[in-house]
Regions:
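General beta-strand structural signal in soluble alpha/beta enzymes
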Residues: 74, 97, 123-127
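Beta-loop-alpha module in the N-terminal Rossmann-like domain of NAD(P)-dependent dehydrogenases
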Residues: 55-90, 102-105
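Rossmann-fold NAD(P)-binding glycine/threonine-rich loop
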Residues: 100-121
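A short helix->loop->beta-strand "cap" motif at the edges of active sites that frequently abuts
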Residues: 51, 91-94, 118-121
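NAD(P)-binding Rossmann-fold cofactor-contacting core
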Residues: 27-45
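Active-site-lining helix/loop region of Rossmann-like oxidoreductase modules
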Residues: 7, 124, 129-276
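A short, Lys/Arg-enriched amphipathic alpha-helix followed by its capping loop at the start of a domain
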Residues: 19-27
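Glycine-rich adenosine-cofactor-binding loop
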Residues: 5-16
């Protein structure tokens, strides 16, 4: 039985916890939750009294509970990855990272990869709210171009740093509007809560600078849509994913939660895997 800890208890953390409690993840038991917000920790206690809870990372990190963990799942933010990722890897824990936008910092990515090798700890990035990362990885040496177009309802984009300097008023959008066209490195800085998928795609393929991203706001859509086009000497890959937004966080697709759950399930059943 693998002992699991969660960092962050937002919509994705709640879905992972609920799935584990329904015994849908064989060989996994969530025994700890860390979240900086004490009111969030209180809500976990009220719902699941048999889980050790922490709102201070040092207390969590130095606890006997932490020492017993096999796997930690980050489902908080890219800032949390940068703040805690190195320590977790140095403690020889396998780390599932959902806020892959943290790896727009190439130096930090290189650092974690080095620590991972040094400490024999694995870093896993779920496919998230898209599909086809296995295929993109398999043809990465043969890619000529890689693009992703993300379309979301304006309410899913509220709070994005992009709007601090843009003349576009999010609340006045009444038809499909292209907000951004550029590379994945710039996209994750301007839309950090919305395009982790672009960074995951870039890491699987041709890198952040060479992965093209278009972001569209559409007040008529009820789904989060991601369209991926990869072209090269191998042929062409065209993927369209239309996700239902998370019921508790419209910025996140429900598929992102399901992908994290499947990543944990696969990690806890190492004798049989589908896909690379």
């Amino acid at each position: 039985m693998k002992k699991v800890g969660l960092i962050g208890y937002g919509s994705i953390g709640r879905e992972i916890m609920a799935s584990a409690k329904r015994q849908e993840i064989p060989n996994a038991k969530i025994i700890a939750v860390f979240d900086k917000q004490s009111q969030v920790i209180d809500s976990v206690y009220n719902e699941y009294g048999d889980v050790d809870l922490f709102s201070d990372f040092d207390e969590f990190y130095n606890s006997q509970t932490y020492a017993s963990l096999d796997i930690i799942i980050e489902c908080a933010s890219k800032d949390a990855v940068r703040e805690f990722g190195g320590k977790i890897i140095e403690s020889k824990k396998d780390l599932i990272i959902l806020s892959v936008g943290a790896f727009s910092d190439k130096e930090y990515l290189t650092k974690l990869q080095y620590l991972s090798t040094l400490n024999s700890a694995r870093i896993l990035i779920p496919t998230g709210a898209i599909a086809g990362l296995d295929s993109i990885r398999s043809v990465r040496k043969y890619l000529d171009s890689l693009t992703i177009t993300t379309t979301k309802h304006p309410k899913s984009l509220v709070g994005a740093p992009f709007f601090k300097s843009s003349k576009i008023n999010l609340h006045n959008i009444n038809s499909e509007t292209v907000l951004f066209e550029g590379n994945a490195s710039t996209a994750i800085d301007l839309f950090p809560a919305n395009v982790n998928v672009a960074v995951a795609l870039a890491l699987a393929g041709v890198g952040l600078e060479n992965t093209r991203v278009k972001i569209i706001a559409d007040p008529m859509t009820s789904v989060n849509k991601h369209e991926i086009i990869a072209k090269g000497s191998f042929g062409q890959i065209h993927i369209i994913v239309q996700n239902i937004p998370s019921p508790t966080n419209p910025k996140t697709s429900y598929l992102a939660s399901l992908s994290a759950i499947e990543c944990l399930r696969s990690l806890c059943n190492e004798n049989f895997r589908i896909g690379t």
